[in-house]
Amino acid sequence: MSGYLITIGLETHVQLKTRTKMFCGCSLAFGTESNTNVCPVCLGYPGALPVMNREAVKLTVMSGLMLGCEINRVSTFDRKNYFYPDMSKDYQISQQAKPLCLGGGVTIQMPEGQKRIRINHIHLEEDAAKINHSARFSGVDFNRCGTPLMEIVSEPGLSSPEEAMAYLQSLKQILVYAGVSDCNLEEGNMRSDVNISVRPEGQEALGTKVEIKNMNTFKGIYAALEYEIARQLGAVSHGGVIVQETRRWEAELGETQPMRTKENAHDYRYFPEPDLVPIVLSAEQVEAWRALLPELPSMRRVRMMAEYGIPEYDAGVLADAKENADFFEAAARLCGQGQGKTVSNWFMTEIMRLLSETGKTITQCALTPEALAELVALVNGRAINGPTAKELLPELFNNGGMPGVLVHARGLGQVSDAGTLEAFVEQAIRENPKSVEDYKAGKKAAAGFLVGQVMKLSHGKAAPQQVGKLVTEKLAERV
């Protein structure tokens, strides 16, 4: 609706890739029986003291560095007080006064160009328990309670559902690249609270904010944003008033519904956590963690284009998933200079097809960069032809091994002996007189048909280039 501005901000909770919880040694194994990965600390027993997880601090700092944040050399924990069954000690350990990371941002690519979405801060906190509802009762599973989370709070700089999707997808890609989180949406490793407001054009002050809590699918976030924007615009355009509140997304109904009147920070009665000392980081420690960071996906895309001579589209697709880019680069380096485009062609066509058909990732299949490099070398050296290589690839993908071994064991080597090939060509011409007549009549495609017949006679082993040359020569003798 013209005449109004939409403002969106996101608070994204990301589960960090640690083996144990934030303030105790309990396992973070997913899918275990309810209330088995628990101890007095994460159950909130009186007198149980928290011990900070150093790995969680490291991963949060690495995330901040990847996102261009300023690292707070001294940060502190605070208690966020609230009463709800998912937090048995009645407070959550979080960071409010001095978070670990400040500023930074994510660059998104939109049809109209690039846009920088600024980040306000990143802080560490513990996750709450999970409440499971049934028809007869509600139960609380404390396995999740105490899971290390970092909350990435954007500035209210997004103006459409499309921008929100681009921001979240870019954020996920960067965090997965850095190895700080799996960002597995199905397991709840990446969840967002969405804040939306609308205001008339020309009005400086933001409109009344509505928050949609705990969204864990990109599809759901997009749909919730579309609905909530339409709801708010419909209300204000008819003289209605937007109430500051928290709402939830009901996917089955396709609408947001009220949960509670929105709390402000003072409602949580934040105060310093007395059982944890401040996090003090030296400059040397921050730089040591910076040295562990990989390239940003955007930088890797540009470098791969220059280093391997692959098209921008190929580089973009490969760089989108770190494991795909890692595999491609390993295979391209093994193949040697000038083979980047060949390796890219194999990955973008045959390998991507197999990944799509099986639903696997490149790390879940049995194909190795060494096997792909050897397959390319066998084709380049004319030990086998392209069709034979394509027949071998699914077996290498599913069962592993090296193509050279399979070629030797099955007698799949390419036939390049001139006498043998000439005999195949003569047989194909003899058995297909109509194709010869078509060629004489000017139908050059007939030569291609005869090449196919030779390949069939040789069970795909004939060297295609030599066959093509021989067929042309033999047909020329008959014109």
Model-predicted segments: where are they?
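Extended, non-catalytic structural segments that build the interaction scaffolds
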Residues: 285-292, 299, 330-337, 372-384
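Core structural elements
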Residues: 188-200, 268, 305-329, 340-357, ...
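Strongly charged, low-complexity linkers/loops
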Residues: 362-373, 386-456
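Short, amphipathic C-terminal "tail helix"
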Residues: 444-479
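Basic, nucleic-acid-interacting segments
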Residues: 1-295, 306, 312, 334-338, ...
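Amphipathic alpha-helical core segments of compact helical bundles
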Residues: 17, 199, 230, 348-356, ...
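Extended hydrophobic-aromatic, low-complexity segments
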Residues: 279-280, 315, 327-330, 339-342, ...
